[in-house]
Amino acid sequence: MKTYLSIYYLIQFCGHSWIFTNMTTRFLFFGQDAFADTFYSIGLVMQGCQLLSILELAHILLGVEQNGFLPMFLQVAERFIILFVVITSQEEVQSKYIVCALFFIWNLWDVIRYPYDMLAAVDTDYSALTWLRHTWWIVAYPLSVLAEAYTIYESLPYFESLGTYSFKMALPVSLSFHFPYILTLYLVLQPVGMLYICSCLWSERKQYFQRKLKLKKN
């Protein structure tokens, strides 16, 4: 099982590294012109990596990994909502600069997280990488939440005008579903989810440094 986990995390690391390298290279060569077609150049690989991340929930449910299910579920779900429900469904949003910024933040976090998880799967620890894994989220995660919120904000006019995912039913009962209201509710609840996930990540960080301090004393 350790071999399987290390291979899974290696695949994720390679995928996100390719995305990060592609985005960085395109920006260095084309400057701001690269922002507009970020989704068209790396969107398919990004979608593949996010679909693959469902396995991380299965790992927890099957007892392969001991991480908390709810924090992981919320992190996977928020990316699915933003990537597949919001960005993929609205072509006008795909060319926004905020999408490039969001993908950059996501992948800058993942190229740190996945090699750490890969090494942890085979009981290997590099202190610098471990410290970075338990510290970088303090900056990266709140920034990603802000970028996600702004992406939703930018998408609302398009969902409003195009009526994507909204519908009305006359029979057998009168029923109306207005999707922009759901996105607005999501924006209201998003800070609650962010605080919960940050508290879980902070607890992990605290436990790591406490263990490290005990080892030094011994």
Curated annotation (Swiss-Prot):
Record keywords: Membrane included?
A: yes
Q: Which residues lie on this side of the membrane: Cytoplasmic?
A: 1-6, 62-67, 117-136, 202-218
Q: What class of enzyme is it?
A: lyase
Q: In the UniProt entry, which residues are flagged as the active site? A: Y141, E148
Going by the entry's taxonomy, the superkingdom of the source organism is recorded as Eukaryota
- Residue intervals annotated with topology Lumenal: 30-38, 88-96, 160-178
Entry's Gene Ontology BP terms: fatty acid elongation; sphingolipid biosynthetic process; very long-chain fatty acid biosynthetic process
- What does the record give as the reaction this protein catalyses? a very-long-chain (3R)-3-hydroxyacyl-CoA = a very-long-chain (2E)-enoyl-CoA + H2O; (3R)-hydroxyhexadecanoyl-CoA = (2E)-hexadecenoyl-CoA + H2O
Q: In which pathway does it act?
A: Lipid metabolism; fatty acid biosynthesis
Keywords, comma-separated and alphabetical: Endoplasmic reticulum, Fatty acid biosynthesis, Fatty acid metabolism, Lipid biosynthesis, Lipid metabolism, Lyase, Membrane, Transmembrane, Transmembrane helix
| Transmembrane among keywords | yes
Its annotated compartments are: Endoplasmic reticulum membrane
List the GO molecular function terms. 3-hydroxyacyl-CoA dehydratase activity; enzyme binding; very-long-chain (3R)-3-hydroxyacyl-CoA dehydratase activity
Q: Where do the coiled-coil regions begin and end?
A: none
Write the Enzyme Commission number(s) for this entry.
4.2.1.134
Provide one Gene Ontology cellular component. Answer: endoplasmic reticulum membrane
Q: Which InterPro entries match?
A: Tyr_Pase-like_PTPLA (IPR007482)
Q: What is its main location?
A: endoplasmic reticulum
Q: Family, per the entry?
A: Belongs to the very long-chain fatty acids dehydratase HACD family.
Residue ranges crossing the lipid bilayer per the database entry:
7-29, 39-61, 68-87, 97-116, 137-159, 179-201
Name of the protein? Very-long-chain (3R)-3-hydroxyacyl-CoA dehydratase
Tell me, in a sentence or two, what this protein's role is: Catalyzes the third of the four reactions of the long-chain fatty acids elongation cycle. This endoplasmic reticulum-bound enzymatic process, allows the addition of two carbons to the chain of long- and very long-chain fatty acids/VLCFAs per cycle. This enzyme catalyzes the dehydration of the 3-hydroxyacyl-CoA intermediate into trans-2,3-enoyl-CoA, within each cycle of fatty acid elongation. Thereby, it participates in the production of VLCFAs of different chain lengths that are involved in multiple biological processes as precursors of membrane lipids and lipid mediators.
Which region is the signal sequence? none
How does this protein lie in the membrane?
A: Multi-pass membrane protein
